[in-house]
């Protein structure tokens, strides 16, 4: 099996003499390569697509050490410093190489059991935050070079972008994996009557909308190293029919008057990943206000249940007579735990506003327990189950396997009992009339 994984890689390497020389002169790198390819088909394919990553194998001490956020920022800054300000193609390529190198490091640490799952997810999330902050800064600089600076109410130029990147889903919940999309919402707070200072002047709102479009283009363009991240903006106000970049005022108005319950559920995991502290604070105030609104509990339960059933019908395992279990979408799986937590936050934040202070499921479960809303034993059960499920999703991602488990795998992993535990607690919280 290892040989099957390594052969395509060797074929890719044979096309470039430099890589052959690198491996022949660095037996340690070759040893690391074989180890990693043996452990993960994803790693083997990842390096095959980008043989430049072989450089990462030269120093095991570096390969198995994940830098902190400040070090990531410094490295990306230095990579881009060498590139002309108007060389977009090279900026995109260097940013992709940076992300790929660090994803490889994370995968190496995971498959060699150097770090636990939550450290890996935190790192992949920090990597995305660092990268998207740089993408935002580059897009702003390029827009300013073309159209000048946006202006405030006094027609004075605004030198830092009044722009937020809000992370939802896995990036908001600090749970990124190797191939995760980034669920993002872009928000601006440009003065509504203002326009830019350049000769080719733009309305402030149009300036920020084009800046958002530029950021998506930067991420999605296929270069030699592929795309950067797949950015999903469907959680923005009005979804696909909404503006790519919403004003802060429009975002607030939508959340207050037009958002569905599932959009408020999504807001539970939303957090700012890039933007000014002042604007971040304004967003957090809106989020807090929405999440702590008093809700009709039976109506909320019904809406959460209906949305969950719709997802199971569309995304879960079908026609398998219980012989398969979709780890994420089926009853007793990952999404049941996520919905259960989101229901708890929406139901009780009115009395317990501290529930809105964190966005990841592990700490949200702790917060629900600390508030006396969940039994400590149930919290422990859900946390252990959630971590077990997520560890298996990571393992399967690194082996390029589906999240659809056969019944023998479910039993071997001990997931039968875990599913039953989740289903029991789901019924306790969301179907109390049937419990």
What are these model-predicted stretches?
Residues 1-435:
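A nucleotide- and high-energy phosphate-metabolite-utilizing enzyme signature
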């Amino acid at each position: 099996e290892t040989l099957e994984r390594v052969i395509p890689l060797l074929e890719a390497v044979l096309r470039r003499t430099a890589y052959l020389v690198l491996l022949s002169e660095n037996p340690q790198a070759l040893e690391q390569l074989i180890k990693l390819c043996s452990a993960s088909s994803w790693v083997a394919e990842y390096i095959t697509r980008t043989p430049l990553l072989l450089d990462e194998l030269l120093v095991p001490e570096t390969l198995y050490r994940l830098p902190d956020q400040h070090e990531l920022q410094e490295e990306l800054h230095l990579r881009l410093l060498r590139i002309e300000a108007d060389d977009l193609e090279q900026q995109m390529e260097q940013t992709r190489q940076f992300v790929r190198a660090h994803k490889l490091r994370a995968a190496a640490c995971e498959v060699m059991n150097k770090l636990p799952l939550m450290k890996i997810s935190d790192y992949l999330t920090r990597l995305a935050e660092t990268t998207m902050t740089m993408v935002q800064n580059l897009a702003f600089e390029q827009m300013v070079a073309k159209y000048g600076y946006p202006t405030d109410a006094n027609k004075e130029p605004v030198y830092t972008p009044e722009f937020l990147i809000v992370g939802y889903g896995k990036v908001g919940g600090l749970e990124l994996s190797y191939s995760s999309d980034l669920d993002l919402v872009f928000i601006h707070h440009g003065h509504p009557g203002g326009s830019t200072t350049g000769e080719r002047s733009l309305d402030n709102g149009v300036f920020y909308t084009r800046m958002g479009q530029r950021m998506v283009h930067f991420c999605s363009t296929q270069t030699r190293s592929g795309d950067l991240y797949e950015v999903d903006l469907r959680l923005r106000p009005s979804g696909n029919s909404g503006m790519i970049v919403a004003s802060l005022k429009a975002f607030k108005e939508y959340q207050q008057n037009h958002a569905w319950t599932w959009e408020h559920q999504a807001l539970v995991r939303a957090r700012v990943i890039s933007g000014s502290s002042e604007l971040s604070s304004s967003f957090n105030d809106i989020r807090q206000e929405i999440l702590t609104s008093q809700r009709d509990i039976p109506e909320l339960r019904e809406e959460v249940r209906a949305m969950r059933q719709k997802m199971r019908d569309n995304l879960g395992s079908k026609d398998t007579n219980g012989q398969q279990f979709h780890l994420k979408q089926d009853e007793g799986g990952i999404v049941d735990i996520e919905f259960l937590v989101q229901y708890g936050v929406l139901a009780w934040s009115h009395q317990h506003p501290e529930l809105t202070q964190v966005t990841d499921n592990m700490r949200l479960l702790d917060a629900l327990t600390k508030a006396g809303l969940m039994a400590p034993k149930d919290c422990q059960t859900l946390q252990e189950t959630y971590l077990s499920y997520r560890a298996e999703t990571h393992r399967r991602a690194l082996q390029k396997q589906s999240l659809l488990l056969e019944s023998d795998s479910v039993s071997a992993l001990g997931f039968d009992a875990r599913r039953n535990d989740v289903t029991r607690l789901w019924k306790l919280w969301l179907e109390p009339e049937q419990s």
